[in-house]
Amino acid sequence: MVKNKKIYIISGERSGDLHASNLIQAMKATDPSIQFRGMGGYYSKEAGLDLAVDYSEVALMGFIEVVLGFRKVIKYLSLIKKDLFNYKPDVLVLVDYGGFNMKIAEFAKANHIPVHYYIPPKVWAWNQKRALKLKAFTDKVYSILPFEPDFFKKYDMEVKYVGNPLLDEIKKFKAHDFFFQKNELSYAPIIALLPGSRTQEVLAMLNKMIALVPKFPNAQFVIAGVDGLNPSLYKPAKEAGIKLVFNQTYNLLSHATAAVVSSGTATLETALFRVPQIVVYRTSPISYHIAKRLIRIPYISFVN
């Protein structure tokens, strides 16, 4: 009897979850018998991932924020390692989320589990020596940025560029004809607010974004909400009378005149919709000063 192939996939944020879900769907189209388990969110679960952990329980950004959440991170690292070991997959697929996933890659390699990394850590931005660990702990690496294969050649690594999945997502996207009516919007110009996909980001950014509203009385502000987060996070927006839309980010961007976007993958999505944007981010003072010392690139915007 032929054993069904088992794949363990780990993503740790909305964009990675979306990319992981597309990967699962593509692999299922090739072989419907493949079994998937791991860490992810709404999109991965819908695609058929048996969730060991929902990423929303773990997601943290910033140096001091990770330190403060250290016990939580250690708890879920331990849980995932145990689950991965017991599951005994044919291959581990890591999707972005470098700080967490590199720890898992090291564990998997030590336990003779093949490691494939899809969307590797952006080691070219800071601490480039991390490329040596990536080389040591992975068997194959797949990049969505065209310049990365050349960068990794310096470390004698063969990295395959596989195209950017956002281009595919946006190409197949069809705007909703009744977006305004469905969401009870006026026909005033829309300024889209994208405060982020993590609890920590929404807590840090939402009130700052809401403070912009009185400065633009002729526009309507619409917030791109994330379904997997606690609804209470968006209470300030509801109290301010600002419209919220969930799972409609692309529809929102396709109708927006401008946007204010938390730094991350959403900045690239916004740019691909050709929407002028202001990119913002708010972290702790300690994280900010550490980042200023470590990061080798002058921009916080993925687009730049």
Regions found by a protein language model. Name each.
Residues 1-304:
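Nucleotide-activated sugar donor-binding and catalytic core shared by glycosyltransferases
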